[in-house]
Regions:
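A short SAM/SAH-binding and catalytic strip from SAM-dependent methyltransferases
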Residues: 122-135
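A short glycine-rich, Lys/Arg-flanked "PGG" loop and its adjoining helix->strand segment in the class I
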Residues: 136-148
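Short alpha-helix
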Residues: 181-204
């Protein structure tokens, strides 16, 4: 879920305890219920990001920050060969159970990627960026792992939301767990891609809309507010 305090009514806010477990421990804890948690950002991302990725048969596609494997599954269904990385053992456990044939590895995207010897036709990195310390390293590593002309599809929680103090969170047994969101700007992401050996950048900003509010009624407060940023590019 991505919420701000305004999502909770006064009574709930008063009684809810808040914990900040850190990003990795937070996703480990969230992993068992992540796929069932109504989440406007994820819903919007699901609407656009696969369309941008357009996986083709036989392509090798890296899903960096693959979580529970929602995109790994769709990539596999398209006849491509996915490879998933994530640093949360809990999220990887769910992905492995769901997709036993897909290669997965535990990796911190703030470090050099453990994919030397692999080369990919496309890299997807969906809804991870605001958790990362070093996005410049990330895009350089993506560039190094792509074939010439290979595609990058990057989607992220819109910086305006993070700037408004909204962050990834979930609730369990009267406790709200907050996972944090770094305050990057749109330009921080776009410039880092641009400096990392990519060309043909296309940037899109997607706002909450009526269809999203139909799907998740409390997301009506995001009507016309930018929720999702995507950057597409090709390796030079
Ligand atoms: C919001 S989930 C998105 C998962 C998936 N991409 C999706 O669209 O469902 C964010 C994921 O990023 C992972 N993550 C966050 N920081 C990370 C890091 N530094 N290195 C690797 N994975 C990270 C989390 O473990 C989690 O699985």
């Amino acid at each position: 879920m991505y919420l701000d305090d305004a999502a909770l009514d006064g009574g709930e806010r008063m009684s809810m305890r808040v914990r900040r477990p850190g990003v990795r421990d937070g996703y480990d804890a969230w992993s068992t219920t992540y796929d069932e948690t109504p989440n406007p950002l994820v819903a919007l991302d699901r609407r656009y990001t696969m369309r941008l990725l357009e996986p083709r048969p036989s392509e090798r596609i890296l899903d960096a920050g693959c979580g529970t494997g929602a995109y790994l599954r769709l990539i596999l269904l398209a006849g491509s060969s996915p490879f998933g990385l994530d640093f949360s053992r809990g999220m990887l456990r769910v992905a492995r159970r769901r997709l036993p044939s897909v290669p997965l590895a535990q990796a911190n995207l703030d470090d050099p990627l453990p994919v030397r010897g692999w080369v990919f036709d496309a890299v997807l990195c969906a809804l991870v960026g605001e958790h990362l310390e070093n996005v410049s390293l990330l895009f350089r590593e993506f560039s190094a792992s792509l074939v010439a002309g290979g595609r990058l599809i990057f989607s992220v929680f819109h910086p305006e939301m993070a700037a408004a103090g909204i962050e990834a969170n979930f609730e369990r047994e009267g406790v709200e767990y907050r996972l944090g969101a770094r305050r990057y700007s749109v330009d921080d992401y776009v410039d880092a891609v641009d400096r990392s050996g990519f060309r043909g950048l296309r940037v899109h900003e997607f706002c909450g809309d009526a269809a999203l509010a139909d799907e998740i009624p409390w997301a009506a407060k995001y009507l016309s507010r930018p929720l999702l940023l995507t950057v597409e590019a090709r390796k030079t």
